């Protein structure tokens, strides 16, 4: 049992927000996403937005897969030292993972099923909007996943070029 249930839950949401939609939109596997500069940078920025919303809501976020929440947020805001540390941690995690690891949202897209995007990137964006915290990447990620669900577009790494 934890006295910090909401902080731990939001921290889990941060991990999901930085990975699931991005893999669904790009079609990339977990290691492709985390080891390549462009998707990794988008992932870190998605996390940063989610962390700032959680902090503004008063949640005490916990370390996520060896990454301090504040350091991860700063990495997404361009702090070079924080970014170097986060890139190292993501690389360590990728080396422990199989190359065919695929987040559940990407699997849902592959199978033509509706995703939980409204409860991940969409939820971050909604809560951010309610408290005046901008979450443009989470908003865009949610919209892209929904467009893919409706078969308006196909998953592709090119979809994150404008991020």
What are the residue ranges of the model-derived segments?
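Active-site-proximal catalytic alpha-helix in oxidoreductases
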Residues: 6-34, 38-52
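Rossmann-like flavin
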Residues: 1-2
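NAD(P)-dependent Rossmann-like dehydrogenase/reductase catalytic/cofactor-binding core
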Residues: 33, 42-163
């Amino acid at each position: 049992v934890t006295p910090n249930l909401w902080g731990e839950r939001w921290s889990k949401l941060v991990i999901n927000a930085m990975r699931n939609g991005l893999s669904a939109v790009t079609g990339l596997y977990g290691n492709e996403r985390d080891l390549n500069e462009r998707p990794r940078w988008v992932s870190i920025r998605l996390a940063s937005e989610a962390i700032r919303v959680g902090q503004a809501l008063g949640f005490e976020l916990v370390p996520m897969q060896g990454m301090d929440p504040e350091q991860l947020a700063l990495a997404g805001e361009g702090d070079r030292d924080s970014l170097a540390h986060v890139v190292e941690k993501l690389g360590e995690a990728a080396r422990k993972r199989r190359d065919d690891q695929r987040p559940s949202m990407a699997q849902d897209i592959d199978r033509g099923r509706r995703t939980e995007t409204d409860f991940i990137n969409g939820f971050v964006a909604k809560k951010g909007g309610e408290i005046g915290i901008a979450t443009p990447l989470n908003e865009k990620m949610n919209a892209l996943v929904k467009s893919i669900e409706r078969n308006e577009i196909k998953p592709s790494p090119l979809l994150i070029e404008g991020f």
